[in-house]
Curated annotation (Swiss-Prot):
Gene3D superfamilies: 6.10.160.10, Ribosomal protein L20. It comes from Cuscuta reflexa (Southern Asian dodder). NCBIfam families: rplT_bact. InterPro entries: Ribosomal_bL20, RIBOSOMAL_L20_CS, Ribosomal_protein_bL20_C. Binds directly to 23S ribosomal RNA and is necessary for the in vitro assembly process of the 50S ribosomal subunit. It is not involved in the protein synthesizing functions of that subunit. The keyword rRNA-binding applies. Keywords: Plastid, Ribonucleoprotein, Ribosomal protein, RNA-binding, rRNA-binding. This is Large ribosomal subunit protein bL20c.
């Protein structure tokens, strides 16, 4: 059997990886073997950090809510507010509540008073 030269196919694959790694620094954007290694590593980090980002934002929303609640003296703490929201079947998630708390804290005060009256 004759040897098959796969220059064009391999070049196309390397060119695709080179384009992906064009923003990397040093040899990570020039040498083929390190390009593939760093490309895999970058994709793994991106996958991991997408999940981490969700956790970080949830923590941020909870921290903001707790700070506003304690500052205004609405409730004793965040967990009691969330418990009463769920018991009264109010469908406001943490993201919306934290946006309300930052932009218009009086609205959050009205929501908490409504919960207390029920």
């Amino acid at each position: 059997m004759t040897r098959i030269k796969r220059g064009s196919i391999a070049r196309r694959r390397r060119k695709k990886m080179c384009f992906f790694a064009s923003s990397f620094r040093g040899a990570h954007s020039r040498l083929t073997r390190t390009i593939t290694q760093q490309g895999i590593r970058a994709l793994v980090s991106a996958d991991r950090d997408r999940d981490r980002q969700k956790r970080d934002f949830r923590r941020l929303w909870i921290t903001r809510l707790n700070a506003v609640i304690r500052e205004m003296g609405i409730y004793y703490n965040y967990s009691k507010l969330i418990r009463d929201l769920y018991n009264n079947q109010l469908l406001l998630n943490r993201k919306i509540l934290s946006q309300i708390a930052i932009s218009n804290s009086k609205c959050l005060y009205m929501i908490s008073n409504g919960i207390l009256q029920i």
